[in-house]
Amino acid sequence: MENSVSEASLYLQDQLDKLRTIIESMLGSSSTLLSMSITPHKSTACLVPGQIDPEATCPACSLDVSHQVSLLVQRYEQLQDMVSGLAASRPSKKAKLQGQDEELLGHVQSAILQVQGDCEKLNITTSNLIEDHRQKQKDIEVLYQGIERLDKEKANREHLEMEIDEKADKSALASKVSRIQFDATTEQLNHMMQELVAKMSGQEQDWQKLLDKLLAEMDSKLDRLELDPLKQMLEDRWKSLRQQLKERPPLYQADEAAAMRRQLLAHFHCLSCDRPLETTVTGQVISVTPIISSMPGHRSVRPYTVFELEQIRQQSRNLKLGSSFPRVDMSQMERSVGRLHSMHSRMLMDMEKVQVHFGGSVKASSQMIRELLHTQCLSHPCYKRGADTADYSYSTVSRRCGGSHTLTYPYRRNRPQHLSPLEEIQIAMKHDEVDILGLDGHIYKGRMDTRLPGILGKDAPGVTKHNKAKLQQLQQLQQLQQLQQLQQLQQAQHARPHAHRQPSLGNMISPPSRPQSAQMIADSKAVPSGQKKDRPVSSEGRLLQSNVSHSSIPTDIASLQGSQQGLNMHIDVPPGEGLEEPTRGPRSTAAH
């Protein structure tokens, strides 16, 4: 009720405030009208009779409005007084009601506190009663358990007296033996008797065997009557032998034989596992064939890497033995690395030129270059009539022979025109075994074989000027691949702690002096793909080939090289610009 009254008074005061603003605006308007009606704007002389001034105001209307506004103001003042009185009378009533409420609240709080105290007392009394009940219940249970135990364990008086009368004497009990002890002693005696019987039977068997042996030996002995004739016979034989030795003394001669026989396979046992072995007898091997000096070595069709790794292994072995090798200084190594970087940058520029050459203003991709070469190869007239024309990939001049003028280059080899082999010929000659250092640091056994290069068929296409320009670009790509191989070798040597870096780097930069080595990239151009697959490759060669195939060469250049390799064309290059050194005869020695 009180809240509703206070809310109503607040609402009335709000409405009065709004009304006050309206009245103030009306007062301003009425005062304006009054001022306008009082002040004349124009003289009446200027007006035409019967004409109304539009800007003039009605004084009567202005007065009526002002009167009504004054009434509203008076009414507002009365309402304001009523609201103010109502608001003033509320605090006194509110204070009186608040005092009564506080007194009642005090009585209620005191009653609540008293009830809380009584509840706490009741809780304490109840808990005490519950605890006493539990204790009494436990005592009752203990009593019941005691009664049950007494019922089970208590003895009858008559039974107790009878048992006391029949109890055993202490002296008689001491003379008795326990049954467990008696059983254990009996078992032990039985075991001992069985052992004695077994020993006696064994001794009897041994005695019988010994007796049989003695009887057999006695039967095999000579009788005393038989000893005298035997003695007489031996003496007669001895005398006859001595007489023969005296009459014919032995002739001692030196050992001579037309031929001798020696055991080649001897019987041995392994020191670790004691396994029987049949191995050859070590010793000097007698050669049955005359020793002839070998022919001069030729350059190998295998890459330089096999020789370089073998040279690194030999250098490390010689260093372990104590021999001294010249070391490459850091300046030479830096110059070599700088030259390597310059060649690599030049090769990248050439690669870009190749792409622009095939693609025009836009760099050609690998697929574009492959399709372009394929269409050029198919549209070439040599391809259309390749079966009818002769092979002009080699020079038609007959090969010179004899003297130092027979020194030829791989790309200037002459082939007899009257021969037309239909298949590839491979002749293998076995040589000594060699050690090959693998990338994992282990040394593997390899065998040196000699293989002649394959002879191309007559279906190889000819060489054109356009293809010559492409071959020059391919040679530059081959140089890039060679540089990448050198970088891979350098990384592999850095990974092996026992390899010496400076000598190996010097060997990689400078061409090796060993004639039995060649470059993998150049030989892959001169040998057909079928023959190259048939050749055995060492573990180093396989790893290097896999590294070259997975290296960071752009795919378009690699496809260009593969498509151009399928043409199997040869071009005359000056010795200074070639990729290989001149060789004497066919380059055929390979390590695998």
UniProtKB/Swiss-Prot annotation:
Tissues and organs where the protein is expressed, per its UniProt entry: Expressed in testis. Not detected in heart, brain, kidney, stomach, ovary, liver, lung and uterus.
Region annotated Disordered, chain positions: 488-592
Function description: Has an essential role in the formation of sperm flagella and flagellar structure maintainance. It acts as a suppressor of ubiquitination and degradation of proteins involved in flagellar development and motility.
Bias-annotated ranges (Polar residues): 544-567
Keywords noted in UniProt: Cell projection, Cilium, Cytoplasm, Flagellum, Membrane, Nucleus, Repeat
Classification via InterPro entries: DUF4795
Family matches, as Pfam families: DUF4795 (PF16043)
Location within or outside the cell: Nucleus membrane; Nucleus; Cytoplasm; Cell projection, Cilium, Flagellum
Subunit note: Interacts with AKAP3, ODF2 and TSSK4. Interacts with AKAP4.
Disruption phenotype: Knockout mice show coiled, bent, irregular, short or absent flagella, defects of sperm flagellar ultrastructure, a significant reduction in sperm locomotion, and decreased sperm count.
Domain of life, source organism: Eukaryota
Organism: Mus musculus
GO process annotations (BP): cell projection assembly; flagellated sperm motility; negative regulation of ubiquitin-dependent protein catabolic process
Full protein name: Glutamine-rich protein 2
Record GO cellular component, one term: cytoplasm
